[in-house]
A protein has these predicted regions:
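Membrane-interface segments at or immediately adjacent to transmembrane helices
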Residues: 278-284, 326-399, 409-419
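Short, conserved active-site loops that position catalytic residues or coordinate cofactors/metal ions
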Residues: 148-163, 187-194, 361-362, 393-407, ...
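Residue-level signal for alpha-helix termini/capping positions
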Residues: 169, 235, 310-313, 387-391, ...
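Second-shell loop/turn segments in exported
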Residues: 216, 372, 405
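Short, Lys/Arg-rich, polar N-terminal cytosolic tail immediately upstream
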Residues: 1-10
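Solvent-exposed soluble domains appended to multi-pass membrane proteins
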Residues: 380, 391, 395-650
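Generic hydrophobic alpha-helical segments
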Residues: 164, 226, 230, 382-386, ...
């Protein structure tokens, strides 16, 4: 190819791409010459590979037109070469991908796609049909947001999503996706508005947290968008298996929820099955089908009612009866379970083998909790409540997550005092605190220490360093940057988030066979199953929900733990620094619930687990099956879509 031919081809290259490459190359070079020694900024041959990788696209007609398709292809190539850069490493053999390179590579693409997103939305906001669909979908998901405890609409969940299914059935795919996205934004904003409270106490800039909140809400909305996209795609199929795929959609939706509980971005906060938590009779079937089974029932009920509207006669009446049948079936089964003598609230609590547990709720304000000047007063208040307000005969005293607001190894006098308190009270004391381990003395290493969010068990008569449990599930972006182990360059990022390392062990403490869970840990069913299989008979959940302020979040957190107690027949002693603390038996009965920001000590004899549930035995298999179902369902939809296109072309 001659130079003239090359220049002729360049004339047809989209102007946006030329600008993109020029800006990328310029910024890369400027950054290199300004700060060539910055950790993570190794703009040498590997760093330039993404630019070099673009050259073949200059000679490929398919990459030039249409431009969006080119951007997709080029994005894949860029990511591939970023991974290659990471593998090649630097002169010291330490693999990484430069942070600046990542930013300068993806920000132009993000700007382009954001502009496309804005244009797409403007188009739909001008269309009457899209606005009608948006109104219906927002009505549906908006009401669902008010169904999660402590809000009251839970029992209506079997019909609340009917307007959304009408949108999916009656409107084209693009309109359905548009309506679902913005309806889900409303839904998730109502559900997670309390994250705004973190801005009042977090160290990161409030504007950055606000941006993070918007991105989180958009990210969570994409799961509903995926469901809408797939449903609308299947709806348009013209083959015999279409009805089967539509009938399996409720399972597909539950599998999306299951997927959301895995990985570094795991956030299993508000599954649809959690909406019935206000009604003890309605949640007893959790012990058989789990929360994802409830999601399947809810989605199936709404889908069937939406399908019933265009039907006639007896068929229509029969389909409209489905939500009532499901509701009363759950109610009858729940009443049957709770009518058994052993299902009485805190049955057999007085048994000698059961421990007496005291929980100390000091309600330390989050803004004051990490103040060095207030450390002594915070610890003194907590310890005084533990010593003065607990009754004789207490076996376990619980202090909240980070009740010691420091790295406990830096506080030898606090450790000594906790040993003395355990001896004086003749009780085990579990307290939350931070801990650390030095892993490097290299001053240039961004992670010279591993930091842990942990709990420590002090037992009477044992003055060795206390037994430690390290929190296993860390809150994304709050306690840890996702994928920082895969991309060590992320360890250089400091946006005010924690930099904790997750734990790996699931302890079972004797003599009462109980297991500690810290905050977020307690909403993951797999951790509960692991502990039960190790012989645990009681969950002890310590948390600090003071971040959430006076909002629905502490009640949502408590509701999830309660539903897990019913699912696995697993009693819970739950202590929150600022509420809501409560005792929960293996059937979900509450006792001594505290109020938010109430200073109080609650204490009782706590019955241990005596119940084996069906879901405990099959839950792991069922949840893994959901993940496989998600993959198979998506592949099936993709294959049929491709076959449909090929048939149309032929």
């Amino acid at each position: 190819m001659t130079i003239d031919q090359l220049l002729n081809k360049l004339k047809f290259l989209p102007r946006a791409y030329k600008i993109y490459v020029a800006v990328l190359a310029t910024i890369e070079l400027v950054l290199f010459f300004l700060r060539p020694d910055t950790p993570g900024l190794y703009i040498q041959i590997p760093q330039l590979l993404p630019i070099v990788a673009a050259i073949p696209f200059l000679f490929m007609k398919g990459a030039r037109s249409p431009f969006p398709r080119f951007m997709n292809t080029y994005g894949i190539i860029v990511f591939t070469f970023l991974a290659l850069d990471y593998a090649l490493g630097d002169t010291n053999g330490e693999g990484h991908a430069g942070l600046y390179q990542i930013v300068t590579t993806f920000i132009p693409m993000a700007i382009y796609w954001f502009s496309q997103f804005v244009r797409w939305n403007v188009k739909h906001f001008k269309q009457k049909e899209s606005l009608i669909a948006l109104g219906l979908a927002t009505c549906a998901w908006g009401f669902v947001a008010f169904a999660f405890p402590p809000l009251p609409l839970g029992p209506a969940m079997f019909v609340l999503l009917v307007p959304w299914f009408i949108v999916l059935n009656k409107f084209n795919r693009e309109t359905a996706v548009f309506a679902t996205f913005w309806a889900s934004m409303v839904y998730n904003t109502v559900n997670y508005y309390w994250i705004r409270n973190v801005m009042n106490v977090e160290t990161a800039p409030s504007g950055l947290i606000f941006l993070g909140l918007i991105l989180l809400i958009a990210y969570l909305s994409l799961f509903n968008v995926l469901a809408a996209f797939v449903y609308s795609t299947v709806k348009n199929f013209m083959f015999k298996g279409k009805a089967i795929l539509l009938a399996l959609f409720p399972i597909f939706f539950a599998s999306i929820e299951m997927f959301r509980t895995h990985g570094d971005f795991a956030f299993p906060w508000n599954h649809l099955g959690y909406t019935l938590g206000n009604h003890l009779e309605l949640i007893q079937t959790l012990s058989i089908i789990g929360v994802f089974g409830y999601t399947i029932l809810i989605m199936a009920s709404n889908q069937i009612v939406a399908y019933a509207f265009p039907q006639n006669g007896r068929k229509k009446f029969a389909l409209f009866a489905v939500p009532f049948i499901i509701f009363f079936a759950l109610l009858i089964h729940g009443n049957s379970v709770l009518s058994a003598p052993e299902a009485a609230p805190f049955y057999d609590a007085g048994n000698e083998e059961n421990p007496t547990i005291a929980m100390i709720q000091p309600s330390i304000a989050q803004g004051a909790k990490w103040s060095k000047e207030r450390f002594d007063s915070i610890v003194t208040k907590t310890f005084s409540m533990a010593m003065d307000s607990t009754k004789p005969g207490t076996n376990i005293i619980l202090l909240a997550e980070t009740a010691i607001p420091d790295h406990i190894r830096r506080q030898p006098m606090v450790i000594k005092r906790l040993h003395e308190m355990a001896d004086e009270k003749d009780a085990s004391i579990l307290t939350g605190a931070l801990d650390y381990k030095r892993i490097s003395r290299d001053l240039n290493n961004p992670r010279r220490f591993e930091i842990y969010n942990a709990s420590f068990l002090f037992t009477p008569g044992d003055h060795r360093f206390p037994r430690r449990y390290i929190k296993k599930h860390l809150v994304p972006f709050s306690e840890r940057i996702p994928f920082d182990e895969v991309f060590p360059i992320l360890n250089y990022v400091d946006l005010g988030e924690g930099d904790f390392v997750p734990g790996k062990e699931t302890p079972v403490y004797g003599p009462y066979n109980w297991t500690p869970y810290i905050c977020y840990d307690a909403i993951f069913g797999d951790l509960v199953r692991d502990a039960i299989h190790e012989g645990s008979r009681l969950m002890v959940n310590i948390t600090n929900d003071g971040w959430f302020g006076r909002s629905t979040a502490p009640y949502q957190h408590l509701n999830i733990v309660r539903l897990l107690a019913v699912t696995y027949g697993y009693p819970v002693a739950r202590l929150a620094n600022s509420g809501v603390s409560a005792f929960i038996d293996q059937y979900g009965h509450y006792d001594q619930n505290t109020k938010i920001f109430e200073t109080r000590v609650i204490q009782r004899k706590m019955p241990l687990k005596t119940r084996s549930t069906f879901y405990t035995a099959v839950g792991g298999f069922f949840e893994n099956a959901l993940l496989w179902f998600l993959a198979v369902y998506l592949v099936a939809v993709f294959v049929v879509s491709k076959l449909k296109k090929l048939k149309t072309r032929s």
